[in-house]
Amino acid sequence: MSEKKIIVVTGATGAQGGGLARAILADPNGGFAVRAITRDPNSDASKALAALGAELVVADVDDEASLVRALDGAYGAFFVTFFWAHFSPAKEAAQVGNMARAAKAAGIKHAVWSTLEDTRRWVPLSDNRMPTLQEKFKVPHFDAKGESNARFTEAGVPTTFFHTSFYWDNFIHFGMGPKAGPDGSLAITLPMGDKKMPGIAAEDIGRCAYGVFKRPDLIGQSVGIAGEHPTGAEMAAAMSKVLGKPIAYHSVSPETYRSFGFPGADDLGNMFQFYADFEEDFGKARSVSFSRSLNPQLQSFEAWLTVNKDRIPLG
């Protein structure tokens, strides 16, 4: 058997990178091996990956030299950033620059960069339908990623631009799950009206990324993934069915959502408005059938709920 191609995974202890690492490790005959980047090889998450067969390497996306060392001898690399750790487009741009330069220096043959749209292509700063944030962005956590695509192109790194969707896991971890109103009734609240919102299970993002690495014909291309395109009402109905409690869908205006006051509420309010205002463009870029071709295990929203129903906080 030929030697396995090494895929270096940033964010290996997080949702996207962890899903990719587990997908590769679950396919011992797939021809790929995992080198997981971690800042702490003694963390429980790092040890869990090592137990599955991952090679651990200590590196940091803020340290370009450490990335060059981590990428040495690898075939491919999965690059992802976590905007919500710092809320800084400038920091994100610096991290992506480090990744792109390190990938070029290491001779990476296939990079998969987890990105999103630069919404300013649709909503220029002069468009007042939504507020401009941090002086020069509409949806900072989208725009910073989309703007950074050029780092890989300019560096000459063979890259697939991998556009993700709304994580359904946000209903578990990000405080978006059903909340009780004054009368005790449960509801999810989103500023989406009756528009469809492409979404996906976080674990499926990693599985789809694995599918991309098996498709060198996707180098130089932009791809988008989703498990389903449900409306808010459809998600509430699925929750009611699977969780066994009546759950309503409350649609609010983007202005109301932006006013909720939690960290990032303005960014997310603008994001949901972008989803709704450009429903056709955003959805068309995220084909469920294409996603399933990358990942035959792709879950629908109801299937994901069924697996995770005990993890969704209520109230």
Where would I find each of the regions flagged by the language model?
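Short, functionally important structural connectors and interaction interfaces within domains
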Residues: 53, 189-192, 222, 286, ...
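A hydrophobic C-terminal alpha-helical subdomain
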Residues: 218, 254-315
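NAD(P)-dinucleotide binding in Rossmann-like oxidoreductases
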Residues: 250-252
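Rossmann-fold cofactor-recognition segment
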Residues: 49-63
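Universal eukaryotic N-terminal targeting presequences
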Residues: 1-2, 314
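Short amphipathic alpha-helical/adjacent loop interface patches that line ligand
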Residues: 96
